[in-house]
C-alpha cells in the first residue's frame, strides 16, 4: 500500500470544486445570506433548457423544470482541492470514499488509483445538474426529443449522466460562474473508471473527461443583435477547455485550448448529450424581452387584422394561456418555403409528396404547411424585435435577429453530429436558411 499526500493539488490550475448543499436548488424564492427581509437574493444567472418554449409539457415542478435561476445560497457550500493520494489497493480507495470526504477518484488500473480530496471553500457556491433526482442534484434534466417534449418512461434510454456537470459561482462580485464536467454523487465522490479518458497534467495533477462529455459554446460578440455562433469545446472535470473528441465517448481527448476558459458568458450553450441549456446573466436578461412585451407584440399583431388571402378570414395568434394543443380556428398557417401566411384550408395537397406538402396558391411553391406559434421563452430571444420570422418546418415565430442566430447555430446531436434546431421546440431546421420571413396580408377594408 502506498499513500502519498501532495499539498500542491490546491494550485490555481486545479478546479475549485464544490460541496452540494442539502437545501436543494436555490431558485429565485430562496433567501440569500445578506438579503434583507422582502429582498431578492443575489442572482448569479439563469439556465434555460432548449426545446420547451417556457414550460415542460407536464408542467414545471420543483427541481425538474425548463428554467432555473441560480442565486446565492444562505451558506457557502464550496470545497477546494486539498490533498492528492496515490493508492495501490482498492481497499484504501473504498475507505477514503466512505469517510464523507469530498473527492475525485481517478482509476488508472485495477491496482492503482489517484484520489484528490477537497476541503471547505467559503467563497463559492455550487449547483449540480444531471438526470438523477437525488437531493444533491439542483436541476434535474431529462433528454429532449426533436420537436419538443422530454423522453420519458422506463424504456427510454437516456444519454444524460446522472451527475452531468456542476456550476461554481463566486459569492462576491462580479459573481463569476464556471462550469465543470461531472458532479458529486451521494457519497460525495466523482468517480472516473478505467475506461474514462483521464491523464496527468504537466504540473503533476490529474484531469479527465466524462463518458459522453460536457460541451460548451460561447457566442461571438455576446448574446445580442450582433451575435454569431462560437466554436464548440469540451470541458474537463477540472474545468480545462479542450477541442472536441472524434466522438462523444472516445477515450482520446482533444487538444488543450489554453486561451479559452470555462467561465460562462451571457448566451453560453451547455450540451449534456441529450439536452442543451442556455446560460443567461442578469445583465443579459435585462436586454431580453419580457413576457409582457411578448404579449403586447401578440396583441399588436392581432390588432393589425391580418387576413387569409384566399378565404379572406381574419387571422389571430391564440393566447399562450391556451397552451399548445390544437390550432385555433383563427390560427395563422404558413407555407414555410415562401412565407405566405394563410388561414387553414384542406386543399392543395400533393399526394406524391406526402400529406404535409402543400402548394401555395399565391406563388405555387410546394412545401410544408404548418400553423404558426409564437415563441414564449423570452430568454431565448436576442432582441425585443417584432415577430417577423418563423422557423422551418415547425412554425415557431420570433424576431428576425433571433431566428437568424439560431438557424446558424449548430447544436450537438448524437455522438458526433451537429444540426441547427428551433430553440423553442427542438425540431431540426430544414431549408436553405432554416427560417422564413412571414408575409401577411392586411385587411381589404
From Swiss-Prot:
Single GO molecular function: ubiquitin-protein transferase activity
Post-translational modification: Phosphorylated by IRAK1 enhancing its E3 ligase activity.
Gene Ontology biological-process annotations: defense response to Gram-negative bacterium; innate immune response; negative regulation of extrinsic apoptotic signaling pathway; negative regulation of protein ubiquitination; negative regulation of Toll signaling pathway; negative regulation of tumor necrosis factor-mediated signaling pathway; negative regulation of type I interferon production; positive regulation of nucleotide-binding oligomerization domain containing 2 signaling pathway
Gene ablation phenotype (knockout): Mice show impaired clearance of C.rodentium due to decreased NOD2 signaling. Mice display decreased muramyl dipeptide (MDP)-induced expression of cytokines.
Catalytic activity from the UniProt record: S-ubiquitinyl-[E2 ubiquitin-conjugating enzyme]-L-cysteine + [acceptor protein]-L-lysine = [E2 ubiquitin-conjugating enzyme]-L-cysteine + N(6)-ubiquitinyl-[acceptor protein]-L-lysine
EC nos: 2.3.2.27
Pathway participation: Protein modification; protein ubiquitination
Membrane-spanning parts: none
Effect of residue 161 to A: Abolished ability to regulate the NOD2 signaling
Region Disordered: start-end pairs: 1-24
Signal peptide: none
Biased composition, class Polar residues, residue ranges: 12-24
Top-rank EC class of the record's enzyme: transferase
Protein's job: E3 ubiquitin ligase catalyzing the covalent attachment of ubiquitin moieties onto substrate proteins. Involved in the TLR and IL-1 signaling pathways via interaction with the complex containing IRAK kinases and TRAF6. Mediates 'Lys-63'-linked polyubiquitination of IRAK1. Can activate AP1/JUN and ELK1. Acts as a regulator of innate immunity by mediating 'Lys-63'-linked polyubiquitination of RIPK2 downstream of NOD1 and NOD2, thereby transforming RIPK2 into a scaffolding protein for downstream effectors, ultimately leading to activation of the NF-kappa-B and MAP kinases signaling.
Subunit structure: Interacts with TRAF6, MAP3K14 and MAP3K7.
Name of the molecule in the record: E3 ubiquitin-protein ligase pellino homolog 3
Annotated organism of origin: Mus musculus
Gene field: Peli3
Amino acid at each position: 500500500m502506498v499513500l502519498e499526500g501532495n499539498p500542491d493539488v490546491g494550485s490555481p490550475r486545479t478546479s475549485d470544486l464544490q460541496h452540494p448543499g442539502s437545501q436543494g436548488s436555490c431558485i429565485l424564492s430562496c433567501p440569500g445570506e445578506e438579503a434583507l427581509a422582502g429582498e431578492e437574493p443575489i442572482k448569479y444567472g439563469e439556465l434555460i433548457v432548449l426545446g420547451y418554449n417556457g414550460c415542460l409539457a407536464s408542467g414545471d415542478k420543483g427541481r425538474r423544470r425548463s428554467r432555473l435561476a441560480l442565486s446565492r445560497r444562505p451558506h457557502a457550500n464550496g470545497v477546494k482541492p486539498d490533498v492528492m493520494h496515490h493508492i495501490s489497493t482498492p481497499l484504501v480507495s473504498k475507505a477514503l470514499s466512505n469517510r464523507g470526504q469530498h473527492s475525485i477518484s481517478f482509476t488508472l488500473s485495477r491496482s492503482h488509483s489517484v484520489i484528490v480530496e477537497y476541503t471547505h471553500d467559503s467563497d463559492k457556491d455550487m449547483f449540480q445538474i444531471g438526470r438523477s433526482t437525488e437531493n444533491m442534484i439542483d436541476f434535474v434534466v431529462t433528454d429532449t426529443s426533436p420537436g419538443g417534449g422530454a423522453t420519458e418512461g422506463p424504456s427510454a434510454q437516456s444519454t444524460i449522466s446522472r451527475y452531468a456537470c456542476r456550476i461554481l459561482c463566486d459569492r462576491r462580485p462580479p459573481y463569476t460562474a464556471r462550469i465543470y464536467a461531472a458532479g458529486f454523487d451521494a457519497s460525495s465522490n466523482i468517480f472516473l473508471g478505467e475506461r474514462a479518458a483521464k491523464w496527468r497534467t504537466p504540473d503533476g495533477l490529474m484531469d479527465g473527461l466524462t463518458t459522453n462529455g460536457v460541451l460548451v459554446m460561447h457566442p461571438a460578440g455576446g448574446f445580442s443583435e450582433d451575435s454569431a455562433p462560437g466554436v464548440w469545446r469540451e470541458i474537463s472535470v477540472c474545468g480545462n477547455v479542450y477541442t472536441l473528441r472524434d466522438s462523444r465517448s472516445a477515450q482520446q481527448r482533444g487538444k488543450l485550448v489554453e486561451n479559452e476558459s470555462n467561465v460562462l458568458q451571457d448566451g453560453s450553450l451547455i450540451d449534456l448529450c441529450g439536452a442543451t441549456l442556455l446560460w443567461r446573466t442578469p445583465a443579459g436578461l435585462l436586454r431580453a424581452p419580457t413576457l409582457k412585451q411578448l404579449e403586447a407584440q401578440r396583441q399588436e399583431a392581432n390588432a393589425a387584422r391580418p387576413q387569409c388571402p384566399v378565404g379572406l378570414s381574419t387571422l389571430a395568434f391564440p393566447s399562450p394561456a391556451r397552451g399548445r394543443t390544437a390550432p385555433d380556428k383563427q390560427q395563422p398557417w404558413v407555407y414555410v418555403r415562401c412565407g405566405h401566411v394563410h388561414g387553414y384550408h384542406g386543399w392543395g395537397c400533393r399526394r406524391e409528396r406526402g400529406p404535409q406538402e402543400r402548394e401555395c396558391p399565391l406563388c405555387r411553391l410546394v412545401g410544408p404547411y404548418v400553423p404558426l406559434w409564437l415563441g414564449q421563452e423570452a430568454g431565448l430571444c436576442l432582441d425585443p424585435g417584432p415577430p417577423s420570422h418563423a422557423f422551418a418546418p415547425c412554425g415557431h415565430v420570433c424576431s428576425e435577429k433571433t431566428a437568424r442566430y439560431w438557424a446558424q447555430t449548430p447544436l450537438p446531436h448524437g455522438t458526433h453530429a451537429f444540426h441547427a434546431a428551433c430553440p423553442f421546440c427542438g425540431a431540426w431546421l430544414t431549408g436553405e436558411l432554416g427560417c422564413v420571413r412571414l408575409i401577411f396580408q392586411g385587411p381589404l377594408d
